[in-house]
Each structure stands twice: as structure tokens, then as C-alpha cells.
Amino acid sequence: MAEGEITTFTALTEKFNLPPGNYKKPKLLYCSNGGHFLRILPDGTVDGTRDRSDQHIQLQLSAESVGEVYIKSTETGQYLAMDTSGLLYGSQTPSEECLFLERLEENHYNTYTSKKHAEKNWFVGLKKNGSCKRGPRTHYGQKAILFLPLPV
């Protein structure tokens, strides 16, 4: 390819017969580490479950600005948040602890970094057993921080 040329590819939705993306619809965040779906329970606990029928895994992602998202449970109405010690929890109201930087990685998974703690590179992560991984224990390259947004 010569410098300045643009190459276009056919839409993947045609090749794989996928529905066009609708970001208004709830998503499931599937974690590469252990095969868990991110879940926000009514008591504010955040963990992972392999039960795809669990209503608490349906999450609404909404953009605050380019690359910045809020992640809200459609069932409980709580927002995913990360406190000052790096613990994930469900918050009733959106705050700066609820804002995450969403990044599409080369392997097509997404990562979510706490915007408030961006200088520390604290990611949303799940351990193999489905429990939350604290922000300070996460780092780039771990499977625990890789999430695949799936349709409900």
C-alpha cells in the first residue's frame, strides 16, 4: 500500500451476520479470566458470575465523553464505582468514582480504567473465582482486566 492510500474493508456485520451495534441496548461484560460476567448486586457488591440468566449482569454503558463511560446495572440502577483503595462497588448516584476510561485493545477486548485513579492505572478486574480484583493488584497484560461486551 502506498503512502496516503486508504484501504477499506467490508463490514464485519455482513461477514459474520452480526446485528448492527446499538449502544442503547444493555450489554454483558464477559471477563476473559475465568469466563465470568461482571455483576452489580442490590447491596452494592460487585463480582462475577457464570450464570448468563442472572438479571444483575445486564449493564448499560453510557458515554460521558469520548472514551469515558458510566457502567450502570439495569436491574439495580447502581453505577459501577472504584473507591480510593481500588475496591469495586455499586453506587446509587453517579460520581467521579463511577467514571471509567474505556479502551479497545488489539485483541478486541475492552479494558476499563478508573478515571479518578488514571495516574495509578487501576483497572476493573475479576479473579478466576469471580471475585473482584482490587485496582492496585491489576496491571496491563492481565487476563483479569479484559472484558468483551456482548449483547443480552
From Swiss-Prot:
Superkingdom field: Eukaryota
SUPFAM superfamilies on file: Cytokine
Propeptide: 2-15
InterPro entries: Fibroblast_GF_fam, IL1/FGF
GO terms under biological process: activation of protein kinase B activity; angiogenesis; branch elongation involved in ureteric bud branching; cellular response to heat; fibroblast growth factor receptor signaling pathway; mesonephric epithelium development; neurogenesis; positive regulation of angiogenesis
Principal location listed in the UniProt entry: secreted
Protein residues bound to heparin: N33
Spans annotated as Heparin-binding: 127-143
GO cellular component: cell cortex; cytoplasm; cytosol; extracellular region; extracellular space; nucleus
Record flagged with keyword RNA-binding: no
Protein name: Fibroblast growth factor 1
Organism expressing this protein natively: Sus scrofa (Pig)
